[in-house]
Amino acid sequence: MYTSGYAHRSSSFSSAASKIARVSTENTTAGLISEVVYREDQPMMTQLLLLPLLQQLGQQSRWQLWLTPQQKLSREWVQASGLPLTKVMQISQLSPCHTVESMVRALRTGNYSVVIGWLADDLTAEEHAELVDAANEGNAMGFIMRPVSASSHATRQLSGLKIHSNLYH
C-alpha cells in the first residue's frame, strides 16, 4: 500500500506534538511534601486545617493513602468528615522505619492524590529530597504528621526572630 509523504509527515507531527505536550505537562506539574506538627491534645486543630484540602483532593479520581502507626480510621469518621469512603486506603501498624519508604513508593506511582504518614522523628535531608522527587514524579501531595505532646510543646524553645521593642521607640 502506498502512503504519501504528507500523510507520514502528519502522523509523525502528531506523535511529536503529543510527546511535547506530555513533556511540558510533566514539567509544569509538581508535587508537594509538607510536615504538619500538631499537639496530641488538640487533634481538632489539625482536622480543621487539613480536611478542606483532603475533601477537595477527594474529588480527584485518585486514592488517598493513610499510613497510620496504630489507630484504624473509623468508617463513620471518614464519612462524617466528607471524605470519599471509596477512595480512602489505610495501612496501619506500619513501623516508622518503613513509613518513609512506603510513602516514596506510593507517591511515585501517581495513583494517590495524597499520602499521609505519621513520623515521630525529623526527616533527614536525604529522606526529604527522596519524598519531594517522588511527589513530583507522581504529581501528588505528601503530609508528614508529627505529633508533639502538650508538655514538650510548652518547654521547647520556639524558633523565630525576636524583635526588640527599642527599635520602634
UniProtKB/Swiss-Prot annotation:
Q: Hey, where's the site called Essential for degradation by Lon protease on this chain?
A: H169
The alphabetical list of record keywords is: Cell cycle, Cell division, DNA damage, Septation, SOS response
| Sequence segments annotated as region (FtsZ binding) | 106-112
Q: Does the keyword DNA damage apply?
A: yes
Q: Does the UniProt entry include the keyword DNA damage?
A: yes
Sorted alphabetically, the Gene Ontology BP terms of this entry are: division septum assembly; DNA repair; negative regulation of cell division; SOS response
Give the induction annotation: By DNA damage, as part of the SOS response.
Q: Where is this region: Lon protease binding?
A: 162-169
What's noted about post-translational modification?
Is rapidly cleaved and degraded by the Lon protease once DNA damage is repaired.
| Subunit comment | Interacts with FtsZ.
Q: Which family does it belong to?
A: Belongs to the SulA family.
The job of this chain, per UniProt, is described as: Component of the SOS system and an inhibitor of cell division. Accumulation of SulA causes rapid cessation of cell division and the appearance of long, non-septate filaments. In the presence of GTP, binds a polymerization-competent form of FtsZ in a 1:1 ratio, thus inhibiting FtsZ polymerization and therefore preventing it from participating in the assembly of the Z ring. This mechanism prevents the premature segregation of damaged DNA to daughter cells during cell division.
Provide the protein name: Cell division inhibitor SulA
Gene, per the UniProt record: sulA
